Swiss-Prot record:
<dbReference type="InterPro" id="IPR000263">
    <property type="entry name" value="GV_A/BR1_coat"/>
</dbReference>
<feature type="short sequence motif" description="Nuclear localization signal">
    <location>
        <begin position="81"/>
        <end position="96"/>
    </location>
</feature>
<feature type="region of interest" description="Interaction with Arabidopsis thaliana NSI protein">
    <location>
        <begin position="150"/>
        <end position="187"/>
    </location>
</feature>
<dbReference type="GO" id="GO:0020002">
    <property type="term" value="C:host cell plasma membrane"/>
</dbReference>
<comment type="similarity">
    <text>Belongs to the begomovirus nuclear shuttle protein family.</text>
</comment>
<keyword id="KW-1035">Host cytoplasm</keyword>
<dbReference type="GO" id="GO:0019028">
    <property type="term" value="C:viral capsid"/>
</dbReference>
<dbReference type="GO" id="GO:0016020">
    <property type="term" value="C:membrane"/>
</dbReference>
<protein>
    <recommendedName>
        <fullName>Nuclear shuttle protein</fullName>
    </recommendedName>
</protein>
<keyword id="KW-1043">Host membrane</keyword>
<keyword id="KW-0945">Host-virus interaction</keyword>
<dbReference type="GO" id="GO:0003697">
    <property type="term" value="F:single-stranded DNA binding"/>
</dbReference>
<dbReference type="GO" id="GO:0046740">
    <property type="term" value="P:transport of virus in host, cell to cell"/>
</dbReference>
<keyword id="KW-1032">Host cell membrane</keyword>
<keyword id="KW-0238">DNA-binding</keyword>
<dbReference type="GO" id="GO:0042025">
    <property type="term" value="C:host cell nucleus"/>
</dbReference>
<comment type="subunit">
    <text>Binds to single-stranded and double-stranded viral DNA. Interacts with the host nuclear shuttle interacting (NSI) protein. This interaction may allow NSP to recruit NSI monomers to the viral genome and thus regulate nuclear export of viral genome by NSP.</text>
</comment>
Length: 256
């Protein structure tokens, strides 16, 4: 004879319960067709442009860069601004890849009333330096960046290997420096220089970050940089009355 198989006590409750439904409800429409339920997201995260490689070209020249003997001027490398248009950077940080620097120096002896005073050659030393500022900061109301003397000491440091003062080494680091000996006998002498500097390597990357309160204030100037700004130091020393006019182009390769 056939035996009757017993069902578990919760069999009816399990399959007759209205609270258990593992599959989405399909609604029926006219014509017998059915359409599955659609899940809609109520909030969306902003879409950010992926990081791309780019090069920013900047030229530094003009009256503020013109140097007399035993003077200096400090500038900075402008970083890209942030914007949704696709130009510049897409984040509040960039990876610094490399820098390509080229320029010319126009050196000339300052002519006096007596032309016999400039009949002999006069000479001087021009120094161009890239300096990493790991913690950029300017107090409120201060516009001037650190001078050559504040970073390296007396101008006589131009004649030897540049070395930061002990009290500046915790914040600054010399990336590269170029020296050019120039001479003139009244006419203008032109000297050229060029170099490439690798910043990030396979083992070590250099990142620069920004404050970026909003897109309106998301530029690449020194005050908006919160980490790893690059200062540009121009210095010219001479024992004679001379002037030096540099024209420099800086190409910064970055990912951002």
């Amino acid at each position: 004879m056939y035996s009757i198989r017993k069902q578990p006590r919760n069999f009816q409750r399990k399959f007759n319960s209205n609270t258990t439904n593992r599959f989405p409800i399909r609604r029926k429409y006219v014509g017998g067709h059915t359409r599955p339920s659609v899940r809609r997201r109520l909030t969306y995260e902003p879409v950010e442009r992926p990081l791309v490689h780019n090069v920013l070209c900047e030229k530094q020249h003009g009256d503020v860069f013109n140097l007399q003997q035993n003077t200096s001027y400090t500038s900075f490398v402008t970083y890209p601004s942030r914007g949704p248009s696709g130009d510049g950077r897409s984040r509040d940080y960039i990876k610094l890849q490399s820098m390509s620097v080229s320029g010319v120096i126009h050196a000339k002896a300052n002519c006096n009333d007596d032309p016999m005073e400039v009949s002999h050659d006069v000479n001087g030393v021009f120094v161009f330096s890239l300096i990493m500022d790991t913690k950029p900061y300017l107090p409120a109301g201060v516009q001037a960046l650190p001078t050559f003397e504040e970073l390296f000491g007396a101008y006589s440091a131009c004649y030897v290997n540049l070395r930061l003062l002990n009290n500046q080494q915790h914040r600054y680091r010399v990336l590269h420096s170029v020296k050019r000996f120039v001479s003139s006998a009244g006419d203008t002498k032109v000297s050229q220089f060029r170099f490439n500097k690798r910043l990030s390597t396979r083992r070590y990357n250099i990142w620069a970050s920004f404050h970026d309160g909003d897109l309106v204030n998301a530029g690449g100037n020194y005050r908006n940089i919160s980490k790893n700004a690059i200062l540009v130091s121009y210095a010219f020393v001479s024992e004679h009355s001379m002037s030096c006019k540099p024209f420099v182009q800086i190409e910064t390769s970055y990912v951002g």
